[in-house]
Design a protein with these regions (language model features):
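Acidic catalytic/metal-coordinating carboxylates
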Residues: 53-54, 81-84
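Alpha4 helix (beta4-alpha4-beta5 surface) of REC/receiver domains from two-component response regulators
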Residues: 84, 105-120, 133
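Non-catalytic signal-transmission and effector/linker regions of two-component phosphorelay proteins
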Residues: 1-24, 129-140
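Two-component/phosphorelay signaling modules centered on CheY-like receiver
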Residues: 32-50
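Short amphipathic alpha-helix used as the core "switch/output" element in two-component signaling
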Residues: 83-95
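Acidic, metal-coordinating helix/loop segments flanking the phosphotransfer/catalytic sites
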Residues: 51-70
């Protein structure tokens, strides 16, 4: 386990990521249909996905699986608001791209997400083109 921690720390310090590390996404959403839809869209760009249905599950996945290049984060989850995790996750994993995806789109939520470090904010429903635009600068 120490080797994984050392590797993750090295990756975060250098921010020089290999192709494999750029191709991992964590999808945090309690709606299974959304998880599968996002996963299918991301697979078209060769991005591997892992699902978490709650914030607690996402924390466990982040602790055990290490680095994810993308985190697609729903806001309204069974155990809290995803938007409240952005700052903490960005502090711990500064080069992870956090992309909020929520049906509850408001100016206040967009502003808070942006101020806390979200890299993008996407309203549901979304199209694959919108998802691709959110990852193109980093997946090319």
């Amino acid at each position: 386990m120490k080797n994984n921690e050392d590797k993750m720390e090295s990756v975060l310090k250098t921010k020089k990521l290999n192709d494999q590390e750029r191709k991992k996404a964590l999808i945090v959403d309690d709606e299974t249909d959304i998880c599968y839809l996002l996963s299918n869209i991301l697979k078209q760009k060769n991005i591997q996905t892992v699902f978490a249905g709650s914030l607690a599950e996402a924390d466990k996945v982040l602790q055990s699986s290490g680095y994810f290049y993308y985190v697609f984060l729903d806001n309204h989850l069974p155990d809290g608001l995803g938007i409240n995790q952005i700052k903490r996750w960005k502090q711990k994993f500064p080069s992870t791209h956090v992309i909020m995806i929520t049906a509850h789109d408001s100016y206040e939520e967009r502003r808070k997400a942006s101020n806390d470090g979200a890299d993008d904010f996407i309203a549901k429903p979304f199209s694959k083109e919108i998802i691709w635009k959110s990852i193109v600068p980093t997946s090319a």
